[in-house]
Amino acid sequence: MNTEPTWMAEVVFDENGLIPAIAQDAETGQILMVAWMSREALAETAATGRAVYWSRSRQRLWRKGEESGHAQDVHELRLDCDGDVILLKVHQNGGIACHTGRASCFYRRLEGTASQAEWITIDPVLKDPELIYK
């Protein structure tokens, strides 16, 4: 007997059973991070209202904030037009989404002309990662 929710049938997972997931601040619209979700992670996220991802490096579910305390409360889940990307509109607890201690994982901007361009860090560290992951 299949206990998977019917809405899951519209979600297109890749050959590894994963789908990219974009976490966006529900209030400001700032993109916080991109991660991956498995069916189990997406189902748990929808059921609990807390963001759960699939850690490709650890090969297990990653409940955002389980180590750092910086959980994501999900306000809304959206599916893109092709069904192959999830958007999570979240409240980021602690204001830190990135393991580097920044609000967003997108803290570097490309500056300069094509051949002279370089990535410049534009967002500050809000909390030392060594204090987050101790």
From Swiss-Prot:
Question: Which keywords belong to this entry?
Answer: Amino-acid biosynthesis, Cytoplasm, Histidine biosynthesis, Hydrolase, Magnesium, Metal-binding, Zinc
**Cofactor binding annotation:** Binds 1 Mg(2+) ion per subunit.
For this record, the Gene Ontology CC terms, alphabetical, are:
cytoplasm
Q: What cofactor does this one take? A: Mg(2+); Zn(2+)
User: What pathway does this protein act in?
Assistant: Amino-acid biosynthesis; L-histidine biosynthesis; L-histidine from 5-phospho-alpha-D-ribose 1-diphosphate: step 3/9
| Annotated localization | Cytoplasm
Domain of life per record:
Bacteria
List of residues binding Zn(2+): 81, 98, 105
Q: Show the catalytic activity.
A: 1-(5-phospho-beta-D-ribosyl)-5'-AMP + H2O = 1-(5-phospho-beta-D-ribosyl)-5-[(5-phospho-beta-D-ribosylamino)methylideneamino]imidazole-4-carboxamide
Q: Major place of localization?
A: cytoplasm
Q: What is its EC number?
A: 3.5.4.19
Gene Ontology biological process terms from the UniProt entry: L-histidine biosynthetic process
Name the Gene Ontology molecular function terms of this record.
magnesium ion binding; phosphoribosyl-AMP cyclohydrolase activity; zinc ion binding
Q: Which residues bind Mg(2+)?
A: 80, 82, 84
Function according to Swiss-Prot or TrEMBL: Catalyzes the hydrolysis of the adenine ring of phosphoribosyl-AMP.
Per the record, the similarity remark reads: Belongs to the PRA-CH family.
PANTHER family documented for this protein: HISTIDINE BIOSYNTHESIS BIFUNCTIONAL PROTEIN, HISTIDINE BIOSYNTHESIS BIFUNCTIONAL PROTEIN HIS7
Q: How does it assemble?
A: Homodimer.
- What is the official name of this protein in its record? Phosphoribosyl-AMP cyclohydrolase
From what organism does this protein derive? Bordetella pertussis (strain Tohama I / ATCC BAA-589 / NCTC 13251)
